[in-house]
């Protein structure tokens, strides 16, 4: 199924990030590992029970990173799906937990509750009719009837949205389904991770990478063959420059920067997060790729403490 595979962002302190996404939002912590390219940094994964594609939000925990800035060439907002009847619950919960948020607004006929995480990342909950019938992680902190059901989608802020729109519809299997208030909406599927929106803001200040910003957005490929076909289409017909395939242990990845400047990834659905630990204990222990196991003691010595036991 086409759509968003995962979103990777940048956080500050790992412990604060863990507390917010597991205890306030009620997501499952599915993997505790490191940035394979910077193994002194945690790479933290959150999602549903097994980390299905379309539910996974990940963070590079760069504690001393400068604050990111929203603007052109960045993802402006990352949105999650919840049952339409749960918006009142979440508004009350955000007040109770001291989460910075705005009033519920309407977009494309849906109720949207914008909020900000502890590092300034802009996010939202979208009330989706019928989402209550979708599977959800049963956390200790959020009743399952109100739980997050994965991603709704992401909003990109771009100077010129036309080339990105062409890439989405031609190479990444999205269709344009609406336009409202300067925002174009594209959909790949009616379920989780199905929506990408483009907000054009010509001449607006460019965004910068840092705490609270999205690092990249990954799109789904069923297998290596589909990944290669999608990447080839993007390269040959849209002029992007793609990397070679990289093994990220839980999926295989190809990266490219789309015409508007946002870093995109195409990630395979397999092998998934149970490849190195049982589903029942996902996220309990620090997992490393085989090429870093010989450095485990040194890596553990520099990583900050992060207690994740139930």
Protein language model annotation of sequence segments:
Residues 145-232, 236-242, 246, 258:
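Surface-exposed interaction/gating patches
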Residues 31-36, 46-80:
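Conserved donor-binding loop and adjoining core beta-sheet/short helix segment
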Residues 2-12, 33, 63-159, 179-199, 238-310, ...:
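Vicinal oxygen chelate
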Residues 13, 48, 82-84, 129, ...:
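Non-catalytic surface loops within mature trypsin-like serine protease
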Residues 1-16, 75-82, 130-165, 208-220, ...:
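N-terminal beta-strand motif that seeds the catalytic metal site of vicinal oxygen chelate
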Residues 9-53, 96, 104-114, 156-199, ...:
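Core segments of cupin and vicinal oxygen chelate
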């Amino acid at each position: 199924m086409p759509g968003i595979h995962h979103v990777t962002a940048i956080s500050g302190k790992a412990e604060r990030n863990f507390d917010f996404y597991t205890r306030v939002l009620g997501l499952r912590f599915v993997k505790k590992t490191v940035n394979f390219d910077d193994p002194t940094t945690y790479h933290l994964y959150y999602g549903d029970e097994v980390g299905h594609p379309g539910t996974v939000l990940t963070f590079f925990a760069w504690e001393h990173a400068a604050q990111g800035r929203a603007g052109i060439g960045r993802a402006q907002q990352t949105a999650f799906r919840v049952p339409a009847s749960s918006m009142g619950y979440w508004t009350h919960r955000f007040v109770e937990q001291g989460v910075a948020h705005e009033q519920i607004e309407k977009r494309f006929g849906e109720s949207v509750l914008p909020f900000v995480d502890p590092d300034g990342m802009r996010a939202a909950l979208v009330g989706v009719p019928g989402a209550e019938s979708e599977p959800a992680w049963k956390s200790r902190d959020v009743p399952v009837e109100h739980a997050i059901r994965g991603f709704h989608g992401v909003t990109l802020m771009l100077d010129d949205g036309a080339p990105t729109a062409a890439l989405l519809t031609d190479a990444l299997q999205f269709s344009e389904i609406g336009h409202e208030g300067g925002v174009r909406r594209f959909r790949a599927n009616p379920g989780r991770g199905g929506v990408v929106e483009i907000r054009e803001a010509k001449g607006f200040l460019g965004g910068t990478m840092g705490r609270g910003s999205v690092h990249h957005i990954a799109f789904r490929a069923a297998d290596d063959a589909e990944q290669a076909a999608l990447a080839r289409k993007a390269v040959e017909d849209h002029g992007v420059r793609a990397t070679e395939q990289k093994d990220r242990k839980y999926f295989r990845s190809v990266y490219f920067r789309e015409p508007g400047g946002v870093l995109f990834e195409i990630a395979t659905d397999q092998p998934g997060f149970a490849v190195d630990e049982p589903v029942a204990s996902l996220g309990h222990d620090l997992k490393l790729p085989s090429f870093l196991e010989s450095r485990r003691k040194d890596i553990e010595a520099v990583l900050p403490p992060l207690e994740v036991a139930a």
